[in-house]
Structure formats: structure tokens, C-alpha cells
């Protein structure tokens, strides 16, 4: 009877573990993410400047922690459209670097430089992390861009 109870418990445990859901992050190259979001539908302000995250001045102090990443920005300096996606081994350091950028460099946009759309983009900006990925979006349609990023990495 004990053997039967042990076997039943083992089968039940394996069944529950096998049926449980885990939310894993896919290991996708950030270049694939960039290709999916770098279009006129999601990035409405064209043309767009593309920069490797390791070469972008915001990440100067954390570039050794960056595995790969990109920065997309509007080439028109009075329109705010920033999209950063970085794969890193130190999420908190990269998030802090972006937070510093947001506080220091985006202040003029938050104060209304370039129009009300820019102030709204700063107020509605998104700085999040999922697994080893960190993304920052300050753009008129940040929610749509975020949805595309999450669709790809989850």
C-alpha cells in the first residue's frame, strides 16, 4: 500500500509540475526586435537615426555590461522619439543609466520644447525590464511599440 501511495504521489507531483506554466523570456537578437519596430507604422517620425547601444553616450559607464542593444531616435531634434532596447548582464545599472538620461536630457522635452506631444511622450515614457532585456520608449505611440517588443521576447 505504501508503494502504491508513493507512486501515486510521484505521478501527481510530476503531472502538476509538467502542467504548470512558467513565463520564460525568449533569447532573441535585439537586431530582430529593431527590424520589427523600425517602420513607419510604429515609428511615425521619419527618418530615424540608428545607433549601437555600446556607442551611445548614455551607456558610456555601463557599456561593459551590455551584451547587445540599439538606440533609435528621430533625426529631427525638435521631435522626441526614443526607443532603446538593451540585452544586459546588469539590468539595474542599465536602468539607472537610462533613468539619468530621462532626468537630465529629456527635461527640455518634458517642459514642452517642440510641442505638447513631446511633453506627453516624456510623461508616458516606459522604462521596463523583462529578463535580461531593458527597454525605454519615449514616443507618441509608446504602448504599441512596447506591445511589439513584449510580443517578441515573451
What are the residue ranges of the model-derived segments?
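Bacterial signal peptide processing site
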Residues: 20-23
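Short Gly/Thr-rich strand-loop-strand
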Residues: 91-131
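C-terminal motif of bacterial Sec signal peptides marking the signal peptidase cleavage site
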Residues: 15-18
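A short, solvent-exposed beta-edge/loop patch
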Residues: 117-154
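Post-signal peptide N-terminal segment of mature Sec-exported envelope proteins
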Residues: 26-46
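Second-shell loop/turn segments in exported
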Residues: 81-89, 133-138
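Positively charged n-region of N-terminal signal peptides that target proteins for export
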Residues: 1-5
Amino acid at each position: 500500500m505504501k508503494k502504491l501511495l508513493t507512486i501515486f504521489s510521484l505521478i501527481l507531483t510530476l503531472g502538476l509540475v509538467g502542467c504548470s506554466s512558467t513565463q520564460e523570456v525568449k533569447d532573441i537578437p535585439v537586431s530582430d526586435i529593431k527590424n520589427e519596430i523600425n517602420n513607419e507604422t510604429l515609428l511615425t517620425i521619419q527618418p530615424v537615426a540608428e545607433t549601437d547601444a555600446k556607442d551611445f553616450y548614455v551607456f558610456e559607464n555601463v557599456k561593459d555590461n551590455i551584451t547587445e542593444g540599439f538606440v533609435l531616435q528621430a533625426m529631427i531634434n525638435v521631435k522626441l522619439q526614443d526607443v532603446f532596447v538593451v540585452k544586459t548582464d546588469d539590468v539595474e545599472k542599465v536602468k539607472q543609466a537610462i533613468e539619468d538620461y530621462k532626468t537630465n536630457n529629456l527635461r527640455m522635452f518634458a517642459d514642452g520644447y517642440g510641442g505638447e506631444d513631446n511633453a506627453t511622450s516624456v510623461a508616458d515614457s516606459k522604462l521596463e525590464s523583462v529578463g535580461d532585456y531593458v527597454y525605454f520608449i519615449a514616443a507618441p505611440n509608446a504602448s504599441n511599440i512596447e506591445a511589439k517588443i513584449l510580443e517578441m521576447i515573451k
